[in-house]
Amino acid sequence: MTLDTTFAIRPATPADVTHIQSMIVELAVFEKLEHLVVATEEKLHEGLFGPHPACEAIVGEADGEVVTFALFFHNFSTFLTKRGLYLEDLYVRQSHRGKGYGSRMLKHLARLAVERGCGRFEWSVLDWNTPAINFYQSMGAEVMPDWRICRVTGAPLEALAQG
């Protein structure tokens, strides 16, 4: 692993939406979920920078080029009675992997969580993504085997809401 001294992490700006959107598509292709992506630059801009932002993002630049992003938001733990930081997505472009950028992004987010008084920092990982699981565990994360994600979208969500 070689660290590029020109790598810098900063909060995303509206000018970064195009880069983040393209990396979201790259991530979806990698996760074999590209058929689920309906995100547009306009919707992403609204979610990050609209009147009621739903999330935040940071980007990492190498030699002035945006090569990684992390999108995150706050949740709340009833057990801890503290808010948490939830990492929705972290992505490093294929051409820039193995340089330590992912770990630097995670460490940056961990610092944000501590600075904001969060009781935990969480994210999900696909069970087949062994390299990511190993990476996260090497960073001190506990992969929780007893938990499963429950999700309701589309027509089932509408039916549940009517029900």
State where each predicted segment sits:
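Conserved GNAT-fold acetyl-CoA-binding loop/helix
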Residues: 21-47
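A short helix-loop-beta-strand connector motif used in the catalytic cores of GNAT acetyltransferases and
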Residues: 46-59
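Conserved beta-strand in the GNAT
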Residues: 59, 65-73
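Conserved acetyl-CoA-binding loop of GNAT-fold acetyltransferases
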Residues: 118, 137-146
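Conserved beta-strand-loop-alpha-helix junction that forms the acyl-donor binding cleft
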Residues: 123-132, 151-155
